[in-house]
């Protein structure tokens, strides 16, 4: 789990997301509170529940990007899901409990990687012995072993060469475990546990024996380390730790929650909107979900919901769900100045990406200050006159601007281009000023 302070978390988010200080502060405090809670006594800890967050803001201002970056910082089970992918229990479609099952699978993978990392040294030793056995096979008959000292010395010589990398390109025949092939079984509602058991049964039945393969020692060493590390991991301990990790540190990001708001009066069951909200209630409030790894309690899982709320309002959510999302954060619409900062300030910004891509063809690109201002202004104007899609408009504008250079780059190795205000004007002015063209091209 991340032990970063709120200030450090905001600083990390600043490297990728422009503006939106309120949203950054809220998620930073929520993430830090996960760590603070774990410092409390076990009895008192159970009484401290997470304060779930609802992020409200137009499309393209950074809601989803905050989730993506938070996932990397959290160092805890994290899943991002679209609320529109689910339907009410009993109808065709995914049930909301699948969110927790997927989150548990992520925790299993995360815990397995951590445990395999702890026993990596032992795994390397075992892998090394297997490679030496392949290089220096033991004699088939005991009477062939005439000089054990000589054999031992030879093994030590090869061990030294192996560790120094002198044998990396040598090919050997080695027995490698075959990857297991899973079988997907569609289950009727309420029978997920039976489906999981059937999947496990078929998976075990389909285990293929180890297959002898010819490969270079460097490649074989990596495969054997993974195989040996997997053998050293205790599967029961792994499941217990993963479930504990989900229950205490799990984070669920529910995107597009505004799309499941009820709009106006409708006849018949609203299975993909209000029905989904009703099914989400017990998850957010706290319930027990059955997974193939065991029972998972959701009482202390942090839920962060987000939506544009252009066609609906937060008050259109059912009251019970509103009450379970107590912290509200509004994200601001982006200005032309924000667009300019987005083009230059973040790590691996759009301009840096195009410079690096064209450099692979031997073409030098330079973005002048005037050019960056013109690009930002053009994107902002198109957003104002047509649909406002936020920073995503920059991708469209930049791709149109760089279209000719990208097409001809392979034939112009050694060339240099300066993207200034004149260049931007020549390539974008007609599109920006013509509203019909803007709607279809930008």
Swiss-Prot record:
Which Gene Ontology terms cover its molecular function?
A: ATP binding; ATP hydrolysis activity; peptidase activity; proteasome-activating activity
Record localization: Cytoplasm
Show the Gene3D superfamilies listed in the entry. Answer: 1.10.8.60, DNA helicase RuvA subunit, C-terminal domain, P-loop containing nucleotide triphosphate hydrolases
Pfam families per UniProt: AAA (PF00004), AAA_2 (PF07724)
Keywords tagged on the record = ATP-binding, Chaperone, Cytoplasm, Nucleotide-binding, Stress response
Q: Which GO terms describe its cellular component?
A: HslUV protease complex
From what superkingdom does this record's organism come? Answer: Bacteria
Under CDD domains, the record lists:
RecA-like_HslU
For this UniProt entry, what is the primary localization, expressed as one broad class? Answer: cytoplasm
Residues binding ATP are: 18, 60-65, 255, 320, 392
Gene Ontology terms: biological process? protein unfolding; proteolysis involved in protein catabolic process
Annotated region Disordered: the residues are 133-156
Role, per record: ATPase subunit of a proteasome-like degradation complex; this subunit has chaperone activity. The binding of ATP and its subsequent hydrolysis by HslU are essential for unfolding of protein substrates subsequently hydrolyzed by HslV. HslU recognizes the N-terminal part of its protein substrates and unfolds these before they are guided to HslV for hydrolysis.
Family recorded in the similarity comment: Belongs to the ClpX chaperone family. HslU subfamily.
Q: How does it assemble?
A: A double ring-shaped homohexamer of HslV is capped on each side by a ring-shaped HslU homohexamer. The assembly of the HslU/HslV complex is dependent on binding of ATP.
Name of the protein described by the UniProt record? ATP-dependent protease ATPase subunit HslU
Write down the species. Answer: Shewanella sp. (strain ANA-3)
Taxonomic lineage: Bacteria, Pseudomonadati, Pseudomonadota, Gammaproteobacteria, Alteromonadales
Chain's gene name: hslU
């Amino acid at each position: 789990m991340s032990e970063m302070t709120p200030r450090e978390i905001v600083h990390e988010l600043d490297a990728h997301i422009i503006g939106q200080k309120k949203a950054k502060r809220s998620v930073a405090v929520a993430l830090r509170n996960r760590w603070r809670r774990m410092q409390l006594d076990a009895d008192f800890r159970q009484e401290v529940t997470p304060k779930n967050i609802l992020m409200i803001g137009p499309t393209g201002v950074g809601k989803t990007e905050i989730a993506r970056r938070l996932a990397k910082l959290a160092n805890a089970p994290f899943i991002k899901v679209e609320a529109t992918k689910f339907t009410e229990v009993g109808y065709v479609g995914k049930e909301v409990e699948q969110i927790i099952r997927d989150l548990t699978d992520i925790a299993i993978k995360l815990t397995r990687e951590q445990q395999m990392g702890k026993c990596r040294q032992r795994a390397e030793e075992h892998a090394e012995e297997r490679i030496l056995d392949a290089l220096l096979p033991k004699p088939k008959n005991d009477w062939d072993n005439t000089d054990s000292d000589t054999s031992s010395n030879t093994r030590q010589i090869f061990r030294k060469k192996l560790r120094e990398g002198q044998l990396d390109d040598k090919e050997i025949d080695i027995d490698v475990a075959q990857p297991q092939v899973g079988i997907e079984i569609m289950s009727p509602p309420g029978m997920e546990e039976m489906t999981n058991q059937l999947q496990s049964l078929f998976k075990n039945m389909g285990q293929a024996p180890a297959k002898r393969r010819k490969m270079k020692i460097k490649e074989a060493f990596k495969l054997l380390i993974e195989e040996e590390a997997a053998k050293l991991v205790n599967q029961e301990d792994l499941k217990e730790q993963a479930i504990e990790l989900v229950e205490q540190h799990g984070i669920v990001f529910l995107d597009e929650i505004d799309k499941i708001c009820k709009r106006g009066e409708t006849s018949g069951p609203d299975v993909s909107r209000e029905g989904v909200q009703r099914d989400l209630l017990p998850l957010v409030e706290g319930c027990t979900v059955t997974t193939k790894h065991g029972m998972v309690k959701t009482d202390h899982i942090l839920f962060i919901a987000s939506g544009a709320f252009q066609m609906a309002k937060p008050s259109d959510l059912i009251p019970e769900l509103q009450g379970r999302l107590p912290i509200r954060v509004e994200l601001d619409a982006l200005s032309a100045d924000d667009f300019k900062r987005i083009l230059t300030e973040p790590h691996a910004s759009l301009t840096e990406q195009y410079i690096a891509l064209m450099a692979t063809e031997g073409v030098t690109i330079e973005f002048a200050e005037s050019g960056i201002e013109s690009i930002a202004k053009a994107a902002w104007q198109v957003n104002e006159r047509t649909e406002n899609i936020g920073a995503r408009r920059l991708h469209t504008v930049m791709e149109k601007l760089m279209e000719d250079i990208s097409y001809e780059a392979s034939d112009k190795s050694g060339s240099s281009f300066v993207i200034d205000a004149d260049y931007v004007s020549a390539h974008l002015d007609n599109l920006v000023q013509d509203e019909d063209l803007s709607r279809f091209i930008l």
